[in-house]
Amino acid sequence: MYRLMSAVTARAAAPGGLASSCGRRGVHQRAGLPPLGHGWVGGLGLGLGLALGVKLAGGLRGAAPAQSPAAPDPEASPLAEPPQEQSLAPWSPQTPAPPCSRCFARAIESSRDLLHRIKDEVGAPGIVVGVSVDGKEVWSEGLGYADVENRVPCKPETVMRIASISKSLTMVALAKLWEAGKLDLDIPVQHYVPEFPEKEYEGEKVSVTTRLLISHLSGIRHYEKDIKKVKEEKAYKALKMMKENVAFEQEKEGKSNEKNDFTKFKTEQENEAKCRNSKPGKKKNDFEQGELYLREKFENSIESLRLFKNDPLFFKPGSQFLYSTFGYTLLAAIVERASGCKYLDYMQKIFHDLDMLTTVQEENEPVIYNRARFYVYNKKKRLVNTPYVDNSYKWAGGGFLSTVGDLLKFGNAMLYGYQVGLFKNSNENLLPGYLKPETMVMMWTPVPNTEMSWDKEGKYAMAWGVVERKQTYGSCRKQRHYASHTGGAVGASSVLLVLPEELDTETINNKVPPRGIIVSIICNMQSVGLNSTALKIALEFDKDRSD
């Protein structure tokens, strides 16, 4: 019997044995020919032998000493795969990595860890990142869930709120109109929107212009309506900044001014006492303001003006920086009047030109594929869905949805326009940028009296925050030039960062724009600071690129 079993087993394992003849039999029968084989007796004998062999082999195994299972051989079959480790984290589909991404394997691994850190620190349900190098997307990935309830993982195609990055998109519309001679940035806004009343500040007639609106210098309020609280907070921040600057200058010059230390200390204590009530935490933050959760649908930007057009200016236009999303609502109305088109129609044309085909205004009714859900933690520290909001009153300042891929395209279009003028002499065949080089230089030039809340080293420019190149000491920290904008909405956070290459003559003569790193990150959790993470990721890729 043992010999019978061995013979049967050997035949089954041999090439062209049982499995092979079963395959031939199936093909033969499908062709309508008589079945192959040695007759029913041979088949019965073979089946009996197999059954006895399996039973006997089972008995022999029971008597044999236990052995660890053999490691799988990846070359045994083209379909064979190594065993997968079990993980509690959701599987996140990724876009197949382009060949050029292999050059950035180290940067990708390091950046993925940075992304995990910020996600874990804030408890974000999901986060998506995209990176491009010199105009080519080299990495995009999602971590966590786009929809926690239905266990839908984040992926590169996930659509989320981009919040205030919408301001940078609106700036392109304004810039195109300015380039076409249809918009004057420096005349009163009433020339285009007479529905917005003329303003006074402390009894003096003042002018609000498009340029001031773009850089948040118009004095128009943000979500906080209490002018006293806003002014107290500004005073406290100014005092704090002054103290930091004085300390820095003293350290730099090596002077202590010990004689006046006591007097200065006493004065500072008095000033701080005056401003103590306006410290962060006393004043409501944006997410505690009722207007952020509006559910009313507005038909157009002109109609949205009624929310704030009759409110007093908080500061004299041009004198102080006051970040204002409502200022961009007024800019949307200016776009409509200067272009003769509805704001959303004009923006859709721009998105089409830039190949940003998944970027749309956020509306509840339309089916938007791959749209994420948005979350916040309640007072009991439990994850909950955010309430329904209608963003039609602020399309221009924070009402668009997009993907990391579309944001990379937008960033590269801006970087190309910024750099193409430098390459024209060495390559006359280059296409023009979507915006002219002089326009991009204007947009990315810091404006006096402004602030950049997400990086104190920078200033606000024209719908972008800009950090300029700076190095104070030799062989010490070098501050890179970059432009970025962050976003914070109900249940969402975002950032788009552009790190231009520091160009030299060799690069200009042998390469083509855009030259630099673009990073976009979107997250379905509010109040997540992403700019520093985006900058670290950009520098990781820049390091690999340089090597």
UniProtKB/Swiss-Prot annotation:
GO terms for MF: identical protein binding; peptidase activity
Keyword Lipoprotein (UniProt): no
InterPro entries listed in its UniProt record: Beta-lactam-related, Beta-lactam/transpept-like, Mito_Ser_Protease_LACTB
Hydrolase among keywords: yes
Disulfide topology: none
Residue numbers of N6-acetyllysine PTMs: 297, 342
EC number: 3.4.-.-
Annotated spans, Disordered: 62-96
Subcellular location: Mitochondrion
One matching Pfam family: Beta-lactamase
Gene3D superfamilies the record matches: DD-peptidase/beta-lactamase superfamily
Function: Mitochondrial serine protease that acts as a regulator of mitochondrial lipid metabolism. Acts by decreasing protein levels of PISD, a mitochondrial enzyme that converts phosphatidylserine (PtdSer) to phosphatidylethanolamine (PtdEtn), thereby affecting mitochondrial lipid metabolism. It is unclear whether it acts directly by mediating proteolysis of PISD or by mediating proteolysis of another lipid metabolism protein.
Family indicated by similarity: Belongs to the peptidase S12 family.
Protein name in UniProt: Serine beta-lactamase-like protein LACTB, mitochondrial
Organism: Homo sapiens (Human)
Gene, per the UniProt record: LACTB
